[in-house]
Regions:
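Peripheral terminal and linker regions in Fe-S/redox and tRNA-modifying enzymes
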Residues: 1-259
Length: 259
């Protein structure tokens, strides 16, 4: 079966050893590369599921989430963090990705910048993230991620895994000192000009007509277009359901499926 996770990833369970390489190879022509972070590495980056189509959003954060993903995957073998790192991007509407409870939470602002919370998290010793930046330039996102990794590697707990998440740096350093050290590392990271981003959200040119009244239908900011919510119980999907979804989506021009 397949499991849709809270970090917007898809897990495949109960596979045999022979099935794994076959699935990995078959996924390549579909644009799915089965590489990612696990263990003491970055986790899948979250973004508001309706970013780019949600009424009232500040802007579409998907390009920045994708750029952050590629950057973290490119360096994850070269860094040694105490524990995992969770990053989320919110489009500025309802914060369904809970940015204040992430190691890094970027919240889009109407002026094109981000508000940034750091060192938050649930679980044992939970902490609300501390506000590290009010108006972070969107082009500088990767510098802030690099700064957090450096800070985590410098001040994270390598001896006790139960206290090895970024939120515990609020205890060891204190919120104000953590913010100061973090911003100092961000400034140092800016020596690498290659991390500067120049991104533009993709334009949606598809149009629609008519209206749809259904409890699972969500009106997009594009007139006449809708998103449809489907929430499998416990996030579990049987393979047959994916086939049904694929058969349905293949009949709808310009649509996409998001986790």
């Amino acid at each position: 079966f397949l499991k849709l996770t809270t970090c917007e990833a898809i897990q495949m369970h109960d596979l045999t050893p022979d099935e794994v390489p076959a699935i990995m190879e078959a996924a390549i022509p579909c644009g799915i590369i089965t590489r990612g972070g696990g263990g003491d590495n970055p986790r899948n980056i979250q973004a508001s599921p309706l970013t780019g189509v949600q009424p009232g959003e500040a802007f579409d954060v998907m390009p920045w989430a994708e750029a952050a993903t590629e950057y973290l995957l490119s360096i994850c073998r070269d860094i040694h963090m105490p524990r995992k790192l969770k990053v989320a991007f919110c489009n500025g509407v309802d914060d369904c990705v809970h940015t204040a409870f992430r190691d890094m939470g970027f919240v889009a602002q109407p002026d094109g910048t981000f508000k940034l919370y750091i060192a938050g998290g649930l679980g044992g010793g939970w902490r609300m993230g501390i506000l590290a930046a009010e108006s972070l330039p969107a082009e500088d996102v990767l510098y802030y991620i690099r700064g957090m990794i450096t800070t985590f590697c410098q001040h994270g707990n390598y001896q006790n895994r139960a206290k090895a998440r970024t939120r515990f740096m609020q205890e060891t350093l204190g919120p104000d000192e953590l913010r100061r050290v973090f911003l100092e590392n961000v400034a140092a990271a800016k020596a690498d000009e290659s991390l500067k981003l120049h991104l533009t959200p993709a334009a949606i040119t598809k149009t629609g007509t008519g209206t749809l009244d259904d409890p699972r239908a969500i009106a997009q900011k594009q007139p006449g277009l809708y998103a449809v919510a489907y929430h499998p119980i416990g996030g579990r999907l049987i393979p047959e359901k994916l086939v049904q979804l694929d058969n349905l989506l293949s009949t709808i021009p310009g649509c996409e499926c998001r986790v």
